[in-house]
Amino acid sequence: MFCYQCQETAGCTGCTRAGVCGKSARTAALQDLLVYVTRGLCQLTTALRNQGEAIIPEDDRLVTENLFVTITNANFDDDALQARIRATLERNAALRSRLDGAWLSAAARWDGSGDWDDKAQAVGVLSTADEDIRSLRELITYGLKGMAAYNHHVNAYGKSA
């Protein structure tokens, strides 16, 4: 586990065994995995859009909701996180079938096979060895999560951003 998403992080360096907030290592791993499969979804929808193909609004909402549930203290329900990962993997498979996938990233190609705990470890925050790249990637991810939170609230009022 590694999480440094909130101001409560242990010693201002990140939580590594369990979150000060109560997040378990398992939940942190599932959140990392959900972000990973969502990254794949984004690559797939972008590729299809670049080919002039339409993407259904539900795909955009899936991205928003996936990112929203991974923000600080929003969702520690492992069953719900697993369901979201499965739903995203299913959607990724459907979108992938519309593309020549040879050039797709590992996130867009992953089909959910193998041990999810091992995969989460392999794609989690600390899987990026270069600290500068890791920090930049996380900064962008947290910015997107913040935008997703605002979009989630706009959608709650029946509007779209």
Put a short name on every predicted segment.
Residues 1-161:
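Metallocofactor- and cofactor-centric catalytic cores in central/energy metabolism, strongly enriched
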